[in-house]
Amino acid sequence: MKINKKTIGGFLLIVFGISVFFGGGSFGFIIPLAIGSLMTYAGIKRFAAGKTITGIIVGGIGAIMLICSLPFVVGIALAAAMVYYGWKLMKNGSADNGVSSFDPEPASAAYQSHFDDEWEEFLKKK
């Protein structure tokens, strides 16, 4: 499978779909998550550029917004893990087409009956 924009977009749609399923259909936590992520990124960039006070303030506010969105992030992580391991199981399952996962033991000699042989002999006599 080639990874391109469509496959990444499809995966993100699956993850958000499962997340919405777990969250009851609300996209309300996406906005603070995005704003918090952007503010944290901007704070780190400002801190690296030498503007320590504004970098700490902006990054701190962004981190607080991300921490408040922690249940949403955990839900997305759980949904992503489920999708990933489910896909991995599906791909491994399709690779083993010829291998049977259930191999019953042969019937023991004590349990076998000779009914079929006796029935055929009975039919021949008729």
From Swiss-Prot:
Keywords: Cell membrane, Membrane, Transmembrane, Transmembrane helix
Subcellular location, principal: membrane
Membrane topology: Multi-pass membrane protein
Transmembrane segments: 11-31, 56-76
GO CC terms, sorted: plasma membrane
Highest taxon of source: Bacteria
Localization terms from the record: Cell membrane
Coiled-coil zones: none
Induction statement: Induced, via the two-component regulatory system LiaS/LiaR, by antibiotics (vancomycin, bacitracin, nisin and ramoplanin), cationic antimicrobial peptides (human LL-37 and porcine PG-1), Triton X-100 and severe secretion stress.
Protein name stated in the entry: Protein LiaI
Source organism (scientific name): Bacillus subtilis (strain 168)
Name of the encoding gene: liaI
